[in-house]
């Protein structure tokens, strides 16, 4: 497992960040039905509800034989995947279905389970609950070879309207088609900038291949990635009393990303799946002024871009560069513009000359991540520098990062590359 002072532990999570979740927000997240009601009211996609059972009489009177071939029976206030029954398909006789593990379930079994839900057996706070039946999502073809049975989902951690980490959760035979890590599902880290899978963790162990297959964990690109991230932030926007939350999103074959549920107390295994501690990420975005969901996604992808430095070094060898190098900058019109840059490990963040940034179209409002957060000391005191999204190529390697904008007209080079963007390089003196 990763070891670092920046790893977020349960105590730090509870003390430092769960305080951003107010009572009303926790009440919404703890009720799947209330969450769905708010999502639908704000026109955010979520799987349809087929039936709601508030009393034993509702369960007895419900026409179970009219249910579709597959569906999901859930507790409204359940947690950790407990109490969820995933029905795969109808069996030969009426009133019988197969579960994900091939076992048979009858109408009588489902009624009894629904009564168990109402009694509070699976409730987060051990109180009475509501049972409901939800449509079962048809998964996209891209996932078919990565799951045993069941539908994978994507957990996005959102703090201050910025996605700070993401994880694909793959159901396994052990998890019986469910995507909960504590029941045996696989957690797979996702690069925030790309939506590409990176590292896998199963029952606390790192893995490189899907169990019972030779299929690699890394390298799978999640479709509609920016839309998924934006949807996660919008979920926080409609429940603003949840400042730090997990958003579970599923990809429907025909309708695209849909929100399954919100989690006011997200687990921390996502750090292991990404090989990246959370504490520093959360501190970097705390207090930023985020205009909207798209702005939050842009900041996340600039700050937390997956560099794959270790993999690149393993495959290509360490690249040696000079103190001054030619780079290509991705301009606002998507053209690549070549210029010279100074390589400076004494500076943390890269910077670009204001006039050059203006000519390249990088100072447009949608590319400015923040204006007043980053300051430098000048003859007239502390001066704010805007920070922009910045993509460039150095020694054939693409780097997606952030850069401060300053007046470099009296400098020899219009761009400075700081040590934050020099992982995997050796600098020739």
Question: Which functions belong to the PLM regions below?
Answer:
Residues 155, 248-250, 340:
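Short, surface-exposed charged micro-motifs
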Residues 284-429:
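Pepsin/retropepsin-fold aspartyl endopeptidases
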Residues 174-183, 269-273, 361-364, 411-415:
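A short, polar/proline- and glycine-enriched secondary-structure boundary/capping micro-motif
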Residues 214-223, 251-317:
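C-terminal active-site "lid" helix and adjoining low-complexity regulatory extension at the edge
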Residues 118-148, 176-252:
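A long amphipathic alpha-helix within ATP-dependent nucleotide-binding catalytic cores
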Residues 84-110, 159-206:
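Short, His- and charge-rich active-site/binding loops that engage polyanionic ligands
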Residues 157-159, 250-254, 406:
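Short beta-strand micro-motifs enriched in acidic
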């Amino acid at each position: 497992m990763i070891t670092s002072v920046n790893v977020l532990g349960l105590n730090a999570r509870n003390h430092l960040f769960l305080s951003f979740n107010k009572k009303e927000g926790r009440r919404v997240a703890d009720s799947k039905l209330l969450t769905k009601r708010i999502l639908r009211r704000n026109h955010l996609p979520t799987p349809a509800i087929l039936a709601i059972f508030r009393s034993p009489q509702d369960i007895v009177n419900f026409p179970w034989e009219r249910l579709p071939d597959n569906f999901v029976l859930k507790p409204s206030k359940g947690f950790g995947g407990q109490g969820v029954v995933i029905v795969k398909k109808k069996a030969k006789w009426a009133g019988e279905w197969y579960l994900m593990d091939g076992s048979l379930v009858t109408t009588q079994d489902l009624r009894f389970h629904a009564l168990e839900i109402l009694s509070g057996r699976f409730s987060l706070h051990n109180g009475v609950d509501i049972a409901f039946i939800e449509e079962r999502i048809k998964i996209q073809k891209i996932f078919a070879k990565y799951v045993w049975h069941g539908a994978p989902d994507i957990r996005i951690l959102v703090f201050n309207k910025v996605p700070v980490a993401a994880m694909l959760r793959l159901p396994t035979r052990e998890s019986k088609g469910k995507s909960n890590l504590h029941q045996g599902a696989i957690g797979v880290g996702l690069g925030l900038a790309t939506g590409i899978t990176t590292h896998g963790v199963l029952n606390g162990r790192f893995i490189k291949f899907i169990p019972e297959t030779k299929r690699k964990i890394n390298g799978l690109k999640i479709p509609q990635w920016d839309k998924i991230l934006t949807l996660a932030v919008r979920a926080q926007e409609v429940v603003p009393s949840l400042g730090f939350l997990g958003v579970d999103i599923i990809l429907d074959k025909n309708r695209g990303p849909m929100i399954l549920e919100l989690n006011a107390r997200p687990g921390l295994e996502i750090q292991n799946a990404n090989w990246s501690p959370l504490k520093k990420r959360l501190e970097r975005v705390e207090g930023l002024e985020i205009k909207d969901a798209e702005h939050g996604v842009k900041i996340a992808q600039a700050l937390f871009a997956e560099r794959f430095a270790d993999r690149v070094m393993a495959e290509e060898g360490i690249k040696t560069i000079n103190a001054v190098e030619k780079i290509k900058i991705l301009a606002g019109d998507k053209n690549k513009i070549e210029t010279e840059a100074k390589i400076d490990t004494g500076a943390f963040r890269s910077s670009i000359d204001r006039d050059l940034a203006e000519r390249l179209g990088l100072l447009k409002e949608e590319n400015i991540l923040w204006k007043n957060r980053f300051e430098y000391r000048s003859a007239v005191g502390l001066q704010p520098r805007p920070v922009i999204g910045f993509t460039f190529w150095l020694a054939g390697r693409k780097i997606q990062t952030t850069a401060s904008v300053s007046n470099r007209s009296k400098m020899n080079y219009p761009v400075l590359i700081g040590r934050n963007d020099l992982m995997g390089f050796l600098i020739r003196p």
